[in-house]
From Swiss-Prot:
It comes from the Bacteria. Converts 2C-methyl-D-erythritol 2,4-cyclodiphosphate (ME-2,4cPP) into 1-hydroxy-2-methyl-2-(E)-butenyl 4-diphosphate. Its cofactor is [4Fe-4S] cluster. Pathway: Isoprenoid biosynthesis; isopentenyl diphosphate biosynthesis via DXP pathway; isopentenyl diphosphate from 1-deoxy-D-xylulose 5-phosphate: step 5/6. GO terms for biological process: isopentenyl diphosphate biosynthetic process, methylerythritol 4-phosphate pathway; terpenoid biosynthetic process. [4Fe-4S] cluster binds at C298, C301, C344, E351. It catalyses: (2E)-4-hydroxy-3-methylbut-2-enyl diphosphate + oxidized [flavodoxin] + H2O + 2 H(+) = 2-C-methyl-D-erythritol 2,4-cyclic diphosphate + reduced [flavodoxin]. The keyword Iron applies. This is 4-hydroxy-3-methylbut-2-en-1-yl diphosphate synthase (flavodoxin). PANTHER family: 4-HYDROXY-3-METHYLBUT-2-EN-1-YL DIPHOSPHATE SYNTHASE, 4-HYDROXY-3-METHYLBUT-2-EN-1-YL DIPHOSPHATE SYNTHASE (FERREDOXIN), CHLOROPLASTIC. The keyword Iron-sulfur applies. Its EC number is 1.17.7.3.
Length: 421
């Protein structure tokens, strides 16, 4: 098995979660409720946490929102959820933290955008107040720079210097450098203001895949801070998923990235939890972490003119996800389970043998039977109208036997070993 080389960084503690170096890449999400509605926000955080989000960011943009943060924390604690809350501050964060000190205490991390804290001396004072508040409350800070809200005074200074140079760079290259400089200079200021280096996480978000890869490669080479990855706006549907996967997979494979968020634009009627599931699937398909049993299924072809195997694959995936809230506690290691649902004799038996448990359904013109393979061996053949029910029962029994208290696969974790550079 290959060993993935991760950047060696400071390790940042955010409540019970460790971020950086050999620590697992952490999945983050963000609510879209009105934070002033404490009940709705707490319930959505619960939903995101149930889906697998390990930290959740909430908007703190008004006195009404700030006044409810402590209540949101209490509601989550009462429900048994220790999910760390990240306060997303823009424009007026210092005022809200000053007026509502319990807000700052209830949060586990502050997100500060240097581009919209303020200009000149006044902006420096606002930034300083927020950093000192974080230090006093022993909270972590993500200094998050965005392409769309870059500090314009810094950008102008760097553009002017570029024009005056003997070999000026294209403006877009200067803008990328300004993103990095903004993050690094802000982190340096934060340390001088008393925030320890192991309380700082950086991000430099843009919307284009190649730009994100370039910026993070450079940022990662110039600091030892953990990095939060994500496109500023990935977009809707398959475009958003593909863009996020393309960008983050390259960086993660190079050992860059310690927390991730998939910033999908929700489609009408789609669950907010989709961004969490996509993040999990990126990490799991790369072999970096395991969250839920994965289903391998063939794409179908002229040999599989029926939809039986597709329906069974979907049923199995849904069943596994629904069971994980219980299985995660009862059967440690079950998240590494691999199930194959194949549609014909061409690759069906082979893929089924390679999975922990697999079924090869008959293709067009094949004998209407479905052999089931367990740990590489053919164990039983199913046929008739109850194949789905019978196969799920076999999966259930396999999980109990192999991941139960005395199971041989209990606590096993099939992930790529991690080393720090």
């Amino acid at each position: 098995m290959n060993t993935l080389q991760r950047r060696k960084t400071h390790q940042v503690r955010i409540d019970h979660i460790t971020v950086g170096s050999e620590a697992p890449v952490v999945i983050q999400s963000m609510t879209n409720t009105d934070t002033a509605d404490a009940k709705a926000t707490a319930l959505q955080i619960k939903e995101l946490s149930d889906a697998g989000s390990e930290m959740v960011r909430i908007t703190v943009n008004s006195p009404e929102a700030a006044s409810k943060v402590a209540e949101i924390r209490r509601r989550l604690d009462d429900m048994g959820y220790a999910t760390p809350l990240i306060g997303d501050f823009h424009f007026n964060g210092e005022r809200l933290l000053a007026e509502f000190p319990e807000c700052g205490k209830a949060l586990s991390k502050y997100r500060i955008n240097p581009g919209n804290v303020g200009k000149g001396v006044k902006g420096d004072e606002k930034f300083a107040f927020m950093i000192r508040t974080a230090a006093e409350n022993d909270k972590a800070v993500r200094i998050g720079v965005n392409w769309g809200s870059l500090d314009q005074s810094l950008a102008k200074r760097m553009m002017d210097a570029n024009l005056a140079s003997s070999a000026p760079k294209p403006p877009e290259e200067v803008t990328k450098e300004a993103l990095i400089v903004s993050a690094l200079e802000s982190a340096e200021k934060a340390v001088l203001l008393g925030l320890p280096e192991d309380k700082i996480i950086l991000s430099c978000k843009v919307s284009a895949v190649q730009d994100l890869i370039q910026v993070y490669r450079e940022l990662g080479s110039r600091c030892a801070y953990p990095l939060h990855l994500g496109l500023t706006e990935a977009g809707m549907g398959s475009k958003g998923i593909v863009a996020s996967t393309a960008a983050l997979s390259v960086l993660l494979q190079e050992g860059i990235g310690d927390t991730i968020r998939i910033s999908l634009t929700p489609e009408p009627g789609s669950p907010r939890t989709q961004e969490v599931v996509v993040g999990q699937e990126i990490l799991q398909t790369m072999g970096l972490r395991s969250f839920t049993p994965m289903v391998t299924a063939c794409p179908g072809c002229g040999r599989t003119t029926s939809t039986v195997f597709q329906e069974l694959a979907q049923d199995v995936q849904n069943y596994l996800r629904q069971k994980m809230s219980i299985w995660r506690t009862l059967y440690p290691g079950v998240e590494s389970l691999n199930v194959a649902v194949m549609g014909c004799v061409v690759n069906g038996p082979g893929e089924s043998k390679l999975a922990d448990i697999g079924i090869s359904l008959p293709g067009t013109g094949e004998t209407p039977v479905a052999p089931v393979y367990v740990d590489g061996e053919r164990k039983i053949t199913l046929k008739g109208d109850n194949i789905a029910t019978e196969f799920l029962a076999i999966v259930e029994e396999y999980v109990k036997t192999n991941y139960g208290e005395n199971g041989s696969k209990r606590n096993q974790n099939k992930i790529i070993p991690i080393q720090s550079l």
